[in-house]
Amino acid sequence: MQISSRFCPILANILAHRREPDLIKYAHPNFSPFLHRTGIHSIQGVDDSLQLPFCRYFLFRVVTLMPSAQLEVAIQACRKAGNFINRESLDLSAIEAREKAPFDFVSRVDTGAQEHITSIIRQYFPKDSIVAEESGTIVNPGADGVWYVDPLDGTTNFLHGFPHYAVSIAYALKGRVMAAAVYDPVKDELFSAERSRGAFLNNARIRVSGRTDMSKALIGTGFPFRRNDNYETFLPKLERVARSCAGLRRAGSAALDLCYVACGRLDGYWEANLKSWDLAAGSLIVLEAGGLVTDLSAGEDYLATGGICVGTPKIFAPLLMKVTDANTGK
């Protein structure tokens, strides 16, 4: 539980000892212009049981910050798909995979997980569109809401028993990602975020690292793997970054790499030739954790271009300079 109050420490202390798991309580001013400087943040629902005399005396009221329906659905779908993936992982030898494109694999686990996800989304938001990796786009004309679904980001890792893969779901309204959830079923780690409400790992607030020196930064990336990918443009960027940072990691799941930047395990990350479902959830989680996000040309069209660069406020700029499409020198 968190209490936001600079003016009433007694109230904050009393309320902090009320055990309310999975809810975040805020005390915020109800009237006074002076107290209003503490700010009010997209708060819904008043908990009358916490209307203490202290609150009324100091012109405070206590409210509950509840997740949106979209985030609740994304989390529910992530967990259901993750449980399915965990069951299937008990016998990898029984899973057959096919190439949907050269070196790009899909299995019945991908399609099964996606069916779990889309059925939940359809149950609660039947009028929204869905952009999913294994089924393309399900379009509802006139729909403002769009769901980006990657049922198993890191399929190759999964098929080899390499424990680094995730379920990724994002909700966008009129082209702007508003809610996101990424679930690692191996570690039981749920990353989530809503726009202007912060980023969380298993209900605990997360922030990007405080790293400021590129020479001490740990950077993530993804190597080209498709037959027609251009190694000639990638390798100079890889060399520039490798020569300037403490270490490089290529773990094989863009969604988790982005979340690792958000929680401080990585200090930066870049990759090209991704799809919108790879990036939508993780990019919002990074932003809400205090990171910076652009495409590889320093623009904001990463969902469309498929290229992305993210990092801490101090690491982002030097990383982008080394991987930007405009930089062809060393």
Language-model region placement:
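N-terminal subdomain of lithium-sensitive/metallo-dependent phosphomonoesterases centered on the IMPase/IPPase/PAP
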Residues: F60-L152, K314, M321, T328-K330
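Hydrophobic alpha-helical signal/anchor motif
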Residues: I14, I24, I40-V46
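Residue-level signal for inorganic ion chemistry
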Residues: I85, D110, I121, T155, ...
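DPxDG-like acidic metal-binding loop motif
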Residues: P141-F200, S215
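An extended, acidic
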Residues: R207-K330
